[in-house]
Amino acid sequence: MRIELIDLEYGVDPDHSILRIEHLVIEPGQPTALVGPNGSGKTTLLRLLHGLIRPRSGRILGLDSARTAMVFQQSRLLRMSCRHQLMLAGWLAGQPVGQLGAAADLWLKRVGLHEAAGQRATTLSGGQQQRLAIAQALLRQPELLLLDEPTASLDAQQTPLMETLFQGCQSKPHANGEPPSLVFTSHDQHQVKRLARREIRLEQGQIVSDQLL
């Protein structure tokens, strides 16, 4: 999914913009890291790309929220079993009903939660909830994957496993022949180097650098 932002501004206060972007293009197959200090606008940009909030002015071209998935810093899970949580995600993404159970089981195994399939999602530990949220996003096979500090709650053993899944989704083109677009935030510069081909730095709601890695 190719997305273009033009003359975009976002902010609740009409006299102050939290985010201001003159022009930005997100290309498919080019994993992009958003870096910068807390409060620089990284999460706001992800939320705009997901269609959760609307800009005060400007345009976002090419965005289709139905083909987008996001992993938040704080997992948003329902009071149902882990397996049903993933089956619901697949159903909402329009996947065949007869394949929902198998897909859920596959992704639970991939994120190491197969033994917790029947456990209520909201009773999992913070790291387990984050892994379930990652499985939920990847199961949807999105054309745009947005990750907000996706491994912040994970330990040193689980982080590389999740990074491998992120890299794996990049190698699988969609029906249109394009690989998924990946945009993520991270304060871990080593993770940025492992996952990203492009780094965008934000400060005080504006892009101050944009470079290929």
Region spans (language model):
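Helix-to-loop junction immediately C-terminal to a conserved catalytic motif
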Residues: 50
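Q-loop/switch helix immediately C-terminal to the Walker
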Residues: 80-92
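Conserved ABC ATPase "signature" region
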Residues: 98-116
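Conserved ABC ATPase signature
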Residues: 120-124, 128
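Hydrophobic anchor residue at the start of the ABC signature
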Residues: 134
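Catalytic Walker B motif of ABC-type/P-loop ATPase nucleotide-binding domains
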Residues: 145-148
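H-loop/switch region of ABC-family ATPase nucleotide-binding domains
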Residues: 186-187
